[in-house]
Amino acid sequence: MPHTSPETEAQRDSNAPLVVVLLGPTASGKTALALELAERFDLEIINVDSRQLYQEMSVGTAKPSPEQQARIRHHLLDLRPPDQPITLQEFQEEALQAVNQSLAKRGAAFLVGGSGLYLKALTAGLRPPAVAPQPALRRQLAQLGQPLCHQLLNTADPEAAVRIASADALRTQRALEVLYATGAPMSRQTSASPPPWRVLELGLNPLDLRQRISARTQALYSQGLVEETRQLRERYGPELPLLQTIGYGEALQVLAGDLSRPAAIAHTTRRTQQFAKRQRTWFRRQHQPHWLPDDNPLNEAGRLIEAGLG
């Protein structure tokens, strides 16, 4: 059965401010559609992609280009260097500020991204435990290696382990950090206080997603993913957790001579397709978007937003 959330008072109140969410798996076309919608409704885009929060990571995260950012103002891009982790709580604080500014300025706010937990935390008002980063513990966990860390998390907090990809070192370390700092699993410490918004969720899930992912991966390598990875490795070292994520991990192996470029492209494509499958499962269980048609998502999204704005 799909997960459903109880309707909040704000959701029922047609006078509550409108927050539009465009969600979908990686390579589903969110960026292009978001730009069209933002221009049509005079909105600014608030990023909800966890890797795009970091500086110096543009190619591998498919961050909106400088030209696209010049068309529409974007928030929550390039917040910090990649060696300074951003917690879920810190993301919420930054995102809430951007949402409130947009509501005051435009009368509506526009969230775009595929990081399901970040979207859920913001729109449902989840309150994760306030635990400061523990650099010494993170270094120890990095030395243990991501496979063992994820196994430890699966034993101690299986609910969190199901939500966190086995290769996601940053979120695995954060969940273990909370566990060791507080003595209780993160999944049992999160409360909810829904914000006073009406949330309109629009979803993209194209039938040709596998082909889109394959084309996206080829484009990342042709646009300079390996060189971007080289620069990150030189500045921050090969153990940087974000360099273990999809795309960067394979490019790192190319630089080390452990993978050929064609093999890296194939491996990145496969991992991305697996990740997209997990994203779609999350969206089905944790969100209730209006799924947009493949043939004309812009018209349907525009109609729904116009109705929401009244």
Swiss-Prot record:
Alphabetic keyword roster: ATP-binding, Magnesium, Nucleotide-binding, Transferase, tRNA processing
Region annotation Interaction with substrate tRNA: where it falls in the sequence: 49-52
Catalytic activity of the protein: adenosine(37) in tRNA + dimethylallyl diphosphate = N(6)-dimethylallyladenosine(37) in tRNA + diphosphate
InterPro entries: Dimethylallyltransferase, IPT, P-loop_NTPase
Domain of life of the organism encoding this protein: Bacteria
Binding site for ATP: G24, P25, T26, A27, S28, G29, K30, T31
Site (Interaction with substrate tRNA): S115
Segments passing through the bilayer: none
Pfam families: IPPT
Cofactor(s) of this protein: Mg(2+)
One of the protein's GO biological processes: tRNA modification
EC number of this enzyme: 2.5.1.75
Binding site for substrate: T26, A27, S28, G29, K30, T31
Signal peptide boundaries: none
A Gene Ontology molecular function term of the record: tRNA dimethylallyltransferase activity
Family: Belongs to the IPP transferase family.
Subunit structure: Monomer.
HAMAP family, sorted: IPP_trans (MF_00185)
Function: Catalyzes the transfer of a dimethylallyl group onto the adenine at position 37 in tRNAs that read codons beginning with uridine, leading to the formation of N6-(dimethylallyl)adenosine (i(6)A).
The protein's name in its UniProt record: tRNA dimethylallyltransferase
